[in-house]
Amino acid sequence: HTAADLLR
């Protein structure tokens, strides 16, 4: 997953 995905 991506960095943005970790924040979701």
Curated annotation (Swiss-Prot):
Name its cellular compartments: Secreted, Cell wall
Cellular component (GO) terms are: extracellular region
Protein keywords: Cell wall, Secreted
What is the protein name given in its UniProt record? Putative mandelonitrile lyase
